[in-house]
Structure formats: structure tokens, C-alpha cells
């Protein structure tokens, strides 16, 4: 259908990889400020010229009449600064994050021989690590990591309220028990190798404990 619109959710990728909307023939693209160390509650919607877009909120002429209401000026300015810094430092940040990512992947594989790295080892965002651990629940894993001060996820923010295993992991062939025990760690160029060691150390204690409790392990 030639009238189909192509929308890209670039929240995770913006600032981590080059995104060229015109060259990629993207119609609409979403970006969020907090993913690039900007303020929370601010984002950007890129809309290709000529794409019809209906008003979200009627009233004033703010945002070219698309969404009435006073703009979040501090958030907009903060996002602009964060975006500028992200673009200027992208290459250096990619290098640092890739080194941390590969180090963390290596440490997890060394300490958890029955774990599985989800996705390609190299063809992935420089700051993304996603593993599955058999016969444990992702929710329990996240709660226990949180108690140790480690922020993690078992899937996308879109499915954060669901206890079901990731439909994406199931679609790429993971067994139910592996998809249910998935863990996503998103890194920053501000992280350190020492923090990666802390994650692995705490993860080892938690995974061993949860697997020992599992009747299936």
C-alpha cells in the first residue's frame, strides 16, 4: 500500500547510532530526552513534510497547532543541549559503551555457562545487553537486583506491566522458560568497568538463589 506510513521508535537508538530519516525514507520518528541524559518528560516527534497529522489537543497555536498548551520550555532547552552533546560525542560514547558492553557480555558468559545472549554479539546497539537465564522468573530477578541498587529490565518499557515472557524473544525461537528469564541491561558512557563487575557479582548470587528455588532447574 503506497499510503502506508513508516514510523520508527528511535527512543533507544537516538544518540547511539546514526539515524538519517530522509535517506531511510522515514515518515515519522519518536525520540525521548531521558535516554540521552536529558530531562524526563520531553521528547521529539519528527514528521516528514507532507505527512498528514491530526491535532492531538485543540486550542492554542502551540507546536504549529498540533498540540495546544504551554510548552515545557525548560525541558525543550534541556533536551536541545543533551541532543547537541550526544551528537558531538557520539563516536567517543559508542567506543566507550561498546567496550563496556563486550566486557559485560564476556563476564556474564564466563560466570553463567547456561545463560544465553539474545541477539547478535556485534550487530546491536553499543549499550545493549540482553541475556536469558533458564528456569527463573524475570520479575523476581528484577526485584532482587533493584534491592541491590541495580536498575534493569526484562523487556521494553511498553510491556513493563506484563508478566508474560517477551513475545519478541519467543518469536526468534527462545523456549518459554528462557524467554521468561530474560534480563536487559542498558549501559551509559558514564558507567565504569567496576560497575560491570558489581552487576556480575550480585547477579551471580541472585541467579544461583533463584535457580536453586526453581522446581524445574
Model-derived regions: residue spans:
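Pyridoxal 5′-phosphate
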Residues: 1-217
Amino acid at each position: 500500500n503506497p499510503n502506508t506510513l513508516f514510523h520508527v521508535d528511535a527512543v533507544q537508538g537516538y544518540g547511539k547510532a546514526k539515524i538519517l530519516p530522509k535517506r531511510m525514507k522515514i515518515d515519522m520518528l519518536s525520540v525521548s530526552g531521558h535516554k540521552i541524559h536529558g530531562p524526563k518528560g520531553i521528547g521529539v516527534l519528527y514528521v516528514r513534510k507532507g505527512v498528514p497529522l491530526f491535532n492531538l489537543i485543540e486550542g492554542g497555536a502551540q507546536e504549529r497547532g498540533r498540540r495546544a498548551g504551554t510548552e515545557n520550555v525548560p525541558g525543550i532547552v534541556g533536551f536541545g543541549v543533551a541532543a547537541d552533546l550526544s551528537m558531538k560525542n557520539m563516536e567517543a560514547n559508542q567506543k566507550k559503551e561498546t567496550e563496556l558492553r563486550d566486557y559485560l557480555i564476556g563476564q556474564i558468559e564466563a560466570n553463567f555457562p547456561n545463560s544465553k545472549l539474545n541477539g547478535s554479539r556485534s550487530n546491536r546497539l553499543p549499550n545493549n545487553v540482553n541475556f536469558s537465564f533458564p528456569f527463573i522468573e524475570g520479575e523476581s530477578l528484577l526485584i532482587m537486583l533493584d534491592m541491590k541498587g541495580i536498575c534493569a529490565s526484562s523487556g521494553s518499557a511498553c510491556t513493563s506491566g506484563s508478566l508474560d515472557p517477551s513475545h519478541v524473544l519467543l518469536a526468534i525461537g527462545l523456549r518459554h522458560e528462557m524467554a521468561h528469564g530474560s534480563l536487559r541491561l542498558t549501559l551509559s558512557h558514564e558507567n565504569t568497568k567496576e560497575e560491570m563487575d558489581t552487576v556480575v557479582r550480585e547477579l551471580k548470587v541472585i541467579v544461583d538463589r533463584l535457580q536453586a528455588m526453581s522446581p524445574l532447574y
